[in-house]
Regions:
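Short beta-strand segments
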Residues: 22, 59-60, 88-91, 153-156, ...
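ATP/nucleoside-binding phosphotransfer catalytic cores, i.e., glycine-rich phosphate-binding loops
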Residues: 143, 149-225
């Protein structure tokens, strides 16, 4: 997000015609809380660029609202906007994308998910000791993510290496939700060396990437953004 802000400040990138749909949001937490994803997006991106905040959406379900109806409403909002052009993802140490934890249906849509203990432990560093940490979240489903025209997943650090290996080279499995990206025809996986350390065919992936760029340049399909 810092790089996007810099490009905007340099007048090389505008968000004036952008609609944003966040992957997920905690339940039971105020959107103005420092731990909410709404606040995170405001502080790290939205407050610093020319995006219309009326066109920034997060999946929410407040007390008294019907979770199924809220999930369907979010899905409909995405469809009405013309779908998602670029889905930006991270990956959890257990292979989750969004808050689609292991055993999530590969056909899932936006809904409430209970967070695993591993996810709670990994995210506990973001909460103060006496601060409420939600155990539930509203998240886009795996099928929702796969509907995007392009997917960019970024991972850094050795603690993500096992999940990255399972995602890229393991079987398609609900136990590693990120493995569903094997089905996407326009998925880009961006890794540092630590996150890629358990991949057995790193040299091949590097060679194939370079060859792909070369071929696309020859056919005039390559764009350096």
């Amino acid at each position: 997000y810092k790089q996007l802000v810099v490009k905007h400040q340099q007048n090389t990138l505008s968000f004036d015609n952008t609609t944003s749909f966040n992957l997920d949001e905690y339940l039971g937490i105020d959107e103005n809380s420092s731990q909410s994803y709404r606040q995170f997006m405001n502080e790290n991106l939205f407050d610093h660029v020319d995006i219309n905040k009326n066109k920034t959406f997060l999946p929410t379900c407040n007390q008294g609202e019907n979770p199924r109806e809220q999930g369907l409403a979010y899905e409909n909002s995405i469809k009405e906007a013309g779908g998602i052009d670029l889905q930006i993802l991270g990956i959890g140490a257990n292979g989750h994308i969004g808050f689609n934890e292991p055993t999530s249906s590969l056909a899932s849509r936006t809904r409430i998910k209970t967070l695993t203990q591993q996810t709670l432990d990994d995210n506990s560093r973001l909460f103060k000791e006496d601060e409420f940490q939600p155990t539930l979240a509203m998240t886009m489903g795996i099928a929702t993510i796969l509907d995007a025209r392009y997917v960019l997943l970024m991972a850094t650090g050795e603690n993500k290496a096992k999940a990255v290996k399972d995602m890229v080279a393991g079987p398609l499995s609900a136990m590693c939700p990120a493995s569903s990206l094997q089905l996407h025809e326009n998925a880009i996986i961006l890794l540092d060396k630590a996150a890629a350390s358990e991949l057995e065919d790193q040299d091949y992936y590097t060679w194939a990437h370079d060859q792909n760029i070369k071929i696309n340049k020859e056919f005039g399909l390559y764009h350096n953004y």
